[in-house]
From Swiss-Prot:
Pathway: Cofactor biosynthesis; (R)-pantothenate biosynthesis; (R)-pantothenate from (R)-pantoate and beta-alanine: step 1/1. InterPro entries: Cyt_trans-like, Pantoate_ligase, Pantoate_ligase_C, Rossmann-like_a/b/a_fold. This is Pantothenate synthetase. The active site is at residue 33. Its EC number is 6.3.2.1. Disulfide bonds: none annotated. The lineage of its organism: Bacteria, Pseudomonadati, Pseudomonadota, Betaproteobacteria, Burkholderiales. The reaction proceeds by a bi uni uni bi ping pong mechanism.
Amino acid sequence: MLIAHSIADLRSALASRGRPAFVPTMGNLHEGHLSLVRQARTLGDVTVASIFVNRLQFLPHEDFDSYPRTWEADRAQLEVAGCDILFAPREADLYPQAQTFKVQPDPLLADLLEGHFRPGFFTGVCTVVMKLFSAVFGTTGGGTALFGKKDYQQLMVIRRMVEQFALPVDIVAGDTCRAPDGLALSSRNGYLGPAERTKAVELARALRTLSDAALSRPVADWPGLEAAASDALRGQGWQPDYLVVRRRADLQRPDTAPRPGTLVALGAARLGSTRLIDNFEF
């Protein structure tokens, strides 16, 4: 596996290698990331992963400084998974100057749910993804990028960005990987203490219960179902930000009874000091 730190070195490594399949990450890798890398190997001529903890998508009070950096383990896992090129830029490589130009996503999609509770988050995400796409695909004529469904709203925002800017990038979604008890794998699960880890699956169960209830009740009842789901989770010791049911297409609440297979239940809640997100399509 070749490791490139600068954009120039990355582009040199990609020269004459064909179409890349690219998996962007912030490191601290788990099976969800590695499954995307393995899938990428079937979708391009050369498999590229990146590790970069992007300061722009963290709010001032969030965990940028404490976010786990596990370079040696990540590098070894990527090599075993079959990654051809690891792009690991330093901050000065990706942001050599203050990033005064930013990508502002559509507020109808990016200012609700995660965007409401983490203002500016998706601006930071879109800006770094645009820079990464430029680095990886800028001299290759396009390719494929893979993102996990666990970060559902992020996936949708990036898809919309690619459409709006007519980028020559195919976005492929990977299914959420889960622990045997049903907890969605996440780099932030490592923050959980033993007792919290046992309880953490309660978020997934709450979303399953909410999705089942939504299918059996009219749309007019959904706000009450969502409030009850949040109250139940709060009673189990969580601090919920939201538990909602939305259309997959645009993350809005339907006006009329939707067809099964077009909806997603999404949730975000804090257990102790750890904020977890999850979702279920149904």
